Design a protein with these regions (language model features):
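Secondary-structure boundary elements
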Residues: 1-56
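His-Asp-centered catalytic microenvironments across diverse enzyme cores
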Residues: 4, 86-153
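Functionally constrained cores in energy, signaling, and assembly domains
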Residues: 1, 16-20, 68, 110-116
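A generic structural micro-environment signature
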Residues: 15, 44-46, 59-60, 129-134, ...
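Residue-level signal for well-ordered alpha-helical scaffold segments within enzymatic catalytic domains
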Residues: 32-36, 70, 74, 110, ...
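Active-site neighborhood of thiol-dependent amide/isopeptide-bond enzymes
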Residues: 43-103, 107
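A general marker of short, structured functional hotspots
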Residues: 27-29, 64, 96, 117
C-alpha cells in the first residue's frame, strides 16, 4: 500500500522539492499537501495503494493516511499508523445519506504518528481539507474551537 517508489509519487516529491528541504519544512509541506490538495472524499476501498489515492485526488482518514505515510517514508521521515473502531454516528453529515445508511455500525478510523526531533507526534488534522472543513463548520454552525488546526512554528 505504501508504494512510495511509484513513479507518480516520486515525480510529486521531485516537483515539490521536498527532499531538498530541511526535515521540518519537508514534514510541513507533505502535511499541507495531503490536507489541502487531496480533498476529503470516500475512495472505492480503504485498502488501496498510496499512488491510487494520489491519482483519485481525494481520500478520508485511512486512505489519506496511506498517502501521507508513503510520502513521509519516501522523504525519510519515520512514521507509523494507529487505528481503532468508531461508531458510524461520528461521521454523520460527513458522508452522503446513502453511504451513511449502508455503512457498518463500526467503522475503522486511523491516524499517523511522525517521529521528529526525538519525539512521536500524532497528526490527524490532515483528513479534512480547509474548504470542506469551512463548509462543514458553516453548515453545522459549530464553533471552530472543536477542530484542531495544526499550528506550525
Amino acid at each position: 500500500m505504501l508504494d512510495f517508489l511509484n513513479p507518480n509519487i516520486q515525480k510529486l516529491i521531485e516537483k515539490r522539492r521536498w527532499k531538498e528541504q530541511n526535515k521540518f519544512e519537508r514534514l510541513k509541506g507533505i502535511y499541507k499537501f495531503v490536507r489541502d490538495d487531496i480533498l476529503f472524499g470516500y475512495n472505492v476501498d480503504d485498502n488501496i495503494a498510496a499512488s491510487k489515492v494520489l491519482e483519485d485526488g481525494y481520500g478520508q482518514c485511512n486512505t489519506k493516511g496511506t498517502l501521507f505515510m508513503a510520502l513521509l517514508r519516501a522523504c525519510e521521515i519515520p512514521c507509523r499508523i494507529h487505528g481503532f473502531m468508531i461508531n458510524k454516528q461520528l461521521q454523520k453529515g460527513a458522508m452522503s445519506r446513502f453511504v451513511y445508511k449502508n455503512a457498518p455500525q463500526k467503522i475503522f478510523h486511523s491516524w499517523v504518528e511522525v517521529y521528529f526531533e526525538d519525539k512521536w507526534y500524532e497528526l490527524e488534522a490532515f483528513i479534512l481539507d480547509r474548504k470542506y472543513l469551512s463548509k462543514l463548520q458553516k453548515n453545522l454552525q459549530i464553533a471552530t474551537d472543536f477542530f484542531v488546526v495544526m499550528a506550525w512554528r
